[in-house]
């Protein structure tokens, strides 16, 4: 078939490197030295994407159903789930189209494949940017709720949250369109890498500051009750472990992808870098894994959301319960229309 290279690399705008060998395991580089290439089966990749898709759809549906969750904090969580849903969905769509093209089931012209290529690239890039932005927005929201607790509801009003959400979506779509259009410019890839590092630093600084404040608060309670200091140390260790897991998962899942982009800029022809380029699909798989983990960290820890999630699962077999579930039925994509929480 013609167009074989284009079919095999619909996400080629961000993976602008020599095509990896199709044989898994140890591939040889130009010097004949072994080069580790980890093969991700298409079935596994699609399965992970499907898990992420279902998981994030449930989060969006649960937040949309329960009016008690219609607050600025849950609006950010809702939009994080929606962006993660688009990340997994766009990658699943890309993989499915590639498989259909290679099997000859889907026959189309090269111009159509190129249009699909551009559309999926923009969708993937914009959803990735949105996911990173909403992770940062959640960190900022939690920081304000701790350090400005008495003024939180006057600072994080729903109209402000709506404007922030709309700005993130618009900026992400416009930026991704520019990035995909000028992907062959090193400055574009470096901008993506700098943006990732900025989000990483922002989250690290805010969460470390929140941990320090929590430890100070715990120490004050210990002194008030004349308890022993080791209890405070234990609390600090648990908090540090939680923070390490949160930031560690973020870095391990997103870091390799942006390392790939960095190497594309600085050593596109280097033998060692070429070995890393061969594992591009592994880096995408790690991002899909992050979209699976995000709801576990940010959404499912809420007891109210877990309770609503059970109702949503029950509602799947009883359509009428959406009108009786204590909240307006909101279209899952309309995160910016969520209202404030009901008074107690």
UniProtKB/Swiss-Prot annotation:
Residues 64-72, 141-163, 212-240, 301-344 are cytoplasmic. It is found in: Cell membrane. Keywords: Cell membrane, G-protein coupled receptor, Glycoprotein, Lipoprotein, Membrane, Palmitate, Receptor, Transducer, Transmembrane, Transmembrane helix. Glycans are attached at residue 29. Pfam families: 7tm_1 (PF00001). GO terms for cellular component: plasma membrane. Belongs to the G-protein coupled receptor 1 family. Receptor for MSH (alpha, beta and gamma) and ACTH. The activity of this receptor is mediated by G proteins which activate adenylate cyclase. Mediates melanogenesis, the production of eumelanin (black/brown) and phaeomelanin (red/yellow), via regulation of cAMP signaling in melanocytes. This is Melanocyte-stimulating hormone receptor. It comes from Callithrix geoffroyi (Geoffroy's marmoset). The gene is MC1R.
């Amino acid at each position: 078939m013609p167009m074989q290279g284009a079919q095999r690399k619909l996400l080629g705008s961000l993976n602008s490197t020599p095509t990896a060998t199709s044989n898994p395991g140890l591939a040889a580089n130009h010097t004949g030295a072994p080069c580790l290439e980890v093969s991700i089966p298409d079935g596994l990749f699609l399965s992970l994407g499907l898990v992420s898709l279902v998981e994030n759809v449930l989060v969006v549906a649960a937040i949309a159903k329960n009016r008690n969750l219609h607050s600025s904090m849950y609006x950010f969580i809702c939009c994080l789930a929606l962006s993660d849903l688009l990340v997994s969905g766009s990658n699943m769509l890309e993989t499915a189209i590639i498989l259909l093209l290679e099997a000859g089931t889907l026959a189309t012209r090269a111009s159509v494949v190129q249009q699909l290529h551009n559309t999926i690239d923009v969708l993937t890039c914009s959803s990735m940017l949105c996911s990173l932005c909403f992770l940062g927005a959640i960190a900022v929201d939690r920081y304000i709720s701790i350090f400005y607790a008495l003024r939180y509801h006057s600072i994080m009003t729903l109209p402000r949250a709506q404007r922030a959400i709309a700005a993130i979506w618009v900026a992400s779509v416009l930026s991704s369109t520019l990035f995909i259009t000028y992907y062959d410019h090193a400055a574009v890839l470096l901008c993506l890498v700098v943006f990732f590092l900025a989000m990483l630093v922002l989250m690290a600084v805010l969460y470390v500051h929140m941990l320090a404040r929590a430890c100070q608060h715990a120490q004050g309670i210990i002194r008030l009750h004349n308890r022993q200091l080791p209890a405070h140390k234990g609390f600090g260790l648990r908090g540090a472990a939680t923070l390490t897991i949160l930031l560690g998962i973020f870095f391990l899942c997103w870091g390799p992808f942006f390392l790939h982009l960095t190497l594309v800029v600085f050593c596109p022809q280097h033998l060692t870098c070429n070995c890393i380029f061969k594992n591009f699909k592994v880096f995408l798989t790690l991002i899909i894994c992050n979209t699976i983990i995000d709801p576990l960290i940010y959404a499912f820890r809420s007891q109210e959301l877990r309770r609503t999630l059970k109702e949503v699962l029950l509602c799947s077999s009883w359509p009428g319960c959406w009108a009786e579930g204590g909240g307006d039925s909101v279209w899952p994509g309309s995160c910016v229309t969520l209202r404030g929480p009901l008074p107690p």
